[in-house]
Amino acid sequence: MKHLLTFALTLFAVVAIAQNPVLGKWKTIDDETGRIKSVVEITERNGKIYGQVIELFRLPDEDQNPICDECEDDRKDQPALGMEIVRDMVPVAGALEWEDGTICDPKNGKIYDCEMWLEEGNMDELKVRGYIFFLFRTQTWLRQK
């Protein structure tokens, strides 16, 4: 019985370590107002990370179902709700970082190179940086619990 318990605990620990810590639901925060803008669900497909908007938090006077009419790729004229805004993020070996992907701003249709990272000891704040050349903006997304 003792061996079975030890085996079960070891298996649980291995599975917990193997799970990608970035996966899950993250609240995006408006840089200017501090309000929650949306919830993005981060998933993994074929070893890459993707993020889809699964919930929007809009003020009563705002369009409740905005579309990306400024997008120029397959997201053109698609609703922001349900849109895949993060694509093709690749994990950095040995780090809590993902890079070489893109992020789309559905408000203006612009697509930016993207990198994301979790800081050791704080798995509930995801740093998301969109950039073009040397210009960048970093947001902190909060894990939805």
Description of each model-found segment:
Residues 113-117, 123-125:
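C-terminal terminal-subdomain/extension
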